């Protein structure tokens, strides 16, 4: 904190510089050291995980193939919204008042998505969800529009503006047309959103993301999702009048699954040192690493709901046919988590090894 002296010559602290409302977006160096996740970024992650919990709430009553089919696309949209903002802020976050405001408004829009998610796939109730998601994407477009002036980044920002902007228009249009045309527009818009980063991959080499900060953001999001799984175990135990052996064993195994995921992902993530993206091949691997977190996150949420259901039913063994479906799905979800984590970590390790070899050759 800066210091000054008063009339008596005593030192006193003074506040730091105020955030200027119109500070332009700036390119965050991929070699920047000491960068940490900000409190706003952590708040942003918490809001998104709360939205995921809201979207997953119907799974507690319909843990079936149909329930999973309905949950997965809605989760994919929330995950895509989180990823879009996270990748942008990793590159261009200026932490000015406008950037903070756009981030907070995105959090509000995601909350609106979650509020409309319960019947989002019904023909009568999907317009509000589509309009909220369109608003999220338009806010992301506004952020990239602010970053268009950054030297060397215009080819990248232009492609993101065109891709995400076109998808946002389709999302808005979908809220105005009836089903089933509305859902076909969803598919087209989501495909454009997913394809945009891949079409800009060669330009991302010139404007690489911070290869230390972005893994930290993904790691924190994964950690908060794991925390929600632990909350599910607690809710399952809370529903019991006492602690019957079956419920206690199920809760212990559920906590063990969460701990196994944590160990597998974070111990490996810490072992693999992050390196900047220098070539197109490394940029592609970095994109694959990022997208590998989708099955990882999806599996954590689905297995967490499954563990809660098993703990709740274990006391009386009143599992039923739907409950019998819970156990294999939970196991498959856990395997998806572990495979996603393994893919993510192996790609990161290969990037690190390639960067180390290149450094040795240069030296």
Question: What do the predicted segments below correspond to?
Answer:
Residues 346-363:
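Terminal cytosolic tails of multi-pass membrane transporters
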Residues 314-315, 334-335, 359:
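Central hydrophobic cores of alpha-helical transmembrane segments
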Residues 181-185, 325-335:
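Loop-to-transmembrane alpha-helix initiation sites
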Residues 15-38, 42, 47-53, 62, ...:
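Predominantly late transmembrane helices and immediately cytosolic-facing juxtamembrane segments
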């Amino acid at each position: 904190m800066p210091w000054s002296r008063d009339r008596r010559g005593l030192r006193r602290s003074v506040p730091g510089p105020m955030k200027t409302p119109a500070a332009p977006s700036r390119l965050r160096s991929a070699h920047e050291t000491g960068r940490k996740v900000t409190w706003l970024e952590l708040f942003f992650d918490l809001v998104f995980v709360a939205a995921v919990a809201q979207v997953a709430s119907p799974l507690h009553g319909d843990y079936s193939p149909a329930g999973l089919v309905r949950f997965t696309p809605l989760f994919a949209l929330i995950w895509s919204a989180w990823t879009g903002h996270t990748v942008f802020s990793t590159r261009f976050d200026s932490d000015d008042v406008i950037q903070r405001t756009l981030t907070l408004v995105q959090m509000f829009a995601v909350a609106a998505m979650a509020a409309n998610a319960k019947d989002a796939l019904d023909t009568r109730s999907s317009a509000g969800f589509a309009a909220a998601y369109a608003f999220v994407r338009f806010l992301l477009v506004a952020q990239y529009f602010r970053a268009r002036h950054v030297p060397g980044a215009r080819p990248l920002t232009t492609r993101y503006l065109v891709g995400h902007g076109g998808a946002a228009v389709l999302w808005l249009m979908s809220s105005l047309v009836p089903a089933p045309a509305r859902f076909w527009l969803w598919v087209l818009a989501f495909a454009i959103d997913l394809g945009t980063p891949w079409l800009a991959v060669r330009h991302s080499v010139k404007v690489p993301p911070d290869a230390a900060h972005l893994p930290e953001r993904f790691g924190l999001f994964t950690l908060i999702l794991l925390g929600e799984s632990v909350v599910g175990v607690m809710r399952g135990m809370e529903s019991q009048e006492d602690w019957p052996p079956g419920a206690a064993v199920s809760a212990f195994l559920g906590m063990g699954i969460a701990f196994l995921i944590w160990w597998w992902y974070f111990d490996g993530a810490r072992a693999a040192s992050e390196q900047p993206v220098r070539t197109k091949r490394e940029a592609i691997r970095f994109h694959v690493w990022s997208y590998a977190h989708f099955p990882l996150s999806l599996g954590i949420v689905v297995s967490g709901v499954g563990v809660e259901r098993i703990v709740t039913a274990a006391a009386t063994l009143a599992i039923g046919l739907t409950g019998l479906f819970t156990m294999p799905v939970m196991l498959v979800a856990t395997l998806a988590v572990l495979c996603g984590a393994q893919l993510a970590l192996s790609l990161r390790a290969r990037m690190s090894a390639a960067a180390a070899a290149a450094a040795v050759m240069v030296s």
